[in-house]
A protein has these predicted regions:
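Short juxtamembrane and helix-loop transition motifs at transmembrane-helix boundaries
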Residues: 35-48, 75
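Extended, low-polarity transmembrane helix blocks
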Residues: 1-34, 51-59, 63, 70-124
Length: 124
């Protein structure tokens, strides 16, 4: 198991990718608790009951964010993050009717981060 100093050695590109993959979950976790429109997505994606799934999503995102940032069980956390983001890709695809570009609500952003997390899981 790597030491704390090894986990935060920013001369190692893998550590930078791992930390960023975890950190980028933080605004999404925040939104699930403090942005009312977040629930609307879970309703539109037909997750039933939507509020429960929104909190399940927040719990998964919190767990993988902490694990990835700190370098704890990296391979498993990154694999779970990639799976979670793949489910998000499918949900966004269904809600938007297949839009690609993230700036018009498409799934491009989720797919990019799912791939990044998969790379971290393979290296982890």
């Amino acid at each position: 198991m790597p030491s704390v100093t090894e986990n935060f050695d920013l001369t190692n590109g893998f550590n930078i990718l791992r930390i960023i993959c975890g950190a980028f979950f933080v605004p999404h976790i925040y939104a699930k608790f403090f942005v009312p429109e977040a629930l609307g997505f879970f309703v539109a994606a037909k997750f039933r009951p939507p509020k429960v799934w929104m909190y399940v999503s927040a719990a998964i995102e919190t767990a993988v964010a902490v694990a990835l940032v700190l370098g704890i069980y990296t391979m498993y956390a990154a694999a779970l993050a990639a799976l979670h983001l793949t489910i998000a890709v499918v949900a966004v695809y269904r809600v938007t009717g297949g839009k690609w570009l993230w700036n018009i609500g498409g799934y491009e952003y989720c797919l990019f981060w799912a791939i990044c997390c998969a790379v971290v899981a393979m290296h982890g």
